[in-house]
Swiss-Prot record:
Changes after translation: Palmitoleoylation is required for efficient binding to frizzled receptors. Depalmitoleoylation leads to Wnt signaling pathway inhibition.
Keywords: Developmental protein, Disulfide bond, Extracellular matrix, Glycoprotein, Lipoprotein, Secreted, Signal, Wnt signaling pathway
Gene name in the database record: WNT7A
Region (Disordered linker) residue spans: 238-266
GO BP field: angiogenesis; apoptotic process; asymmetric protein localization involved in cell fate determination; canonical Wnt signaling pathway; cartilage condensation; cell proliferation in forebrain; cellular response to transforming growth factor beta stimulus; central nervous system vasculogenesis
This protein's name: Protein Wnt-7a
Lipid attachment points (O-palmitoleoyl serine): 206
Upper taxonomic lineage: Eukaryota, Metazoa, Chordata, Craniata, Vertebrata
Length: 349
């Protein structure tokens, strides 16, 4: 969610809070404010707008999850030509790439995972109605492993289910790009589920572990970012397959001759090759690399040779001056030397 959208929602919810205080009752707030809030959010599909109006308490959490995904995207690609800073058409709380590239695949997966992560966390913290801790993971004893369920396990199934209904509702068109988007959404959620953690606590006299209770917790989102970045590097090129009498694509297969093997559930998939992202291009969502900082000596993607696409780079020199080697003299003053340092910064032409 961009700052303008978050500020808008914040003002709307502040207004709703005032209505709540004056009239009293959450149902009144929902009745008066849900349609206002949901109509102010750009890019919602009809089903998403209906969900928003029925569950306005969840829409802020969904926005935070989407923003968390975008922030992680920018972190993971901070040193690349494409740095997730500018995307194409507007979506739920952000933008999307028009080209069905591996970058688009990563974007969909990380945002889908972010929304599911945020919903699950909000349930665990008691910040959403209709959900809480995982009730099925309470009191059951695992005799072979010597522990039982206790504490508050994160209800990942609820989080994933709610996020799936909302995020996937945007995919209205029946084409190859929709199949790609839905697959990557599911891959992001699946990877989140596979990386859930088990935490345990011992109970007993003098630090003994007579009994042990365990519960599931969400992974740090940064961990998911690294896993999905690896999936991005190994993304699978796919193509749509149409049934004999159906013009609409029905599933995706790996793009290899004489192969009808489907990608794995946790694979990121793409249908178009990535542009080089060297030049600014609104169609592909590329902001170009002109003016980007680069590393003169690094051989990786952040190195000037790769980052600047062979155009060369500018050198900027800066001088930093500060007080150093300060000593206290009796009595009573401090004497310092003046230190200076020259640094160079390189930016793409």
């Amino acid at each position: 969610m961009n700052r303008k959208a978050r500020r808008c929602l914040g003002h709307l919810f502040l207004s709703l809070g005032m209505v709540y205080l004056r009239i009293g009752g959450f149902s009144t707030v929902v009745a008066l404010g849900a349609s206002i809030i949901c109509n102010k959010i750009p890019g919602l599909a009809p089903r998403q707008r209906a969900i928003c109006q029925s569950r306005p308490d969840a829409i802020i959490v969904i926005g935070e999850g989407s923003q968390m995904g975008l922030d992680e995207c920018q972190f993971q690609f901070r040193n690349g030509r494409w740095n997730c800073s500018a995307l194409g058409e507007r979506t739920v709380f952000g933008k999307e790439l028009k080209v069905g590239s591996r970058e688009a695949a990563f974007t969909y997966a990380i945002i889908a995972a972010g929304v599911a992560h945020a919903i699950t966390a909000a349930c665990t913290q008691g910040n959403l109605s209709d959900c809480g801790c995982d009730k099925e993971k309470q009191g059951q004893y695992h005799r072979d492993e010597g522990w039982k369920w206790g504490g508050c396990s994160a209800d990942i199934r609820y989080g994933i289910g709610f996020a799936k209904v909302f995020v996937d509702a945007r995919e209205i068109k029946q084409n190859a790009r929709t199949l790609m988007n839905l697959h990557n959404n599911e891959a992001g959620r699946k990877i989140l589920e596979e990386n859930m953690k088990l935490e345990c606590k011992c109970h007993g006299v003098s630090g003994s572990c007579t009994t042990k209770t365990c519960w599931t917790t969400l992974p740090q989102f940064r961990e998911l970012g690294y896993v999905l970045k690896d999936k991005y590097n190994e993304a699978v090129h796919v193509e749509p397959v149409r049934a004999s009498r159906n013009k609409r694509p029905t599933f995706l297969k790996i793009k290899k001759p004489l192969s009808y093997r489907k990608p794995m559930d946790t694979d990121l998939v793409y249908i178009e090759k990535s542009p080089n992202y060297c030049e600014e291009d609104p169609v592909t969502g590329s902001v170009g690399t002109q003016g980007r900082a680069c590393n003169k000596t690094a051989p990786q993607a952040s190195g000037c040779d790769l980052m600047c696409c062979g155009r060369g780079y500018n050198t900027h020199q800066y001088a930093r001056v500060w007080q150093c080697n300060c000593k206290f003299h009796w009595c009573c003053y401090v004497k310092c030397n003046t230190c200076s340092e020259r640094t160079e910064m390189y930016t793409c032409k």
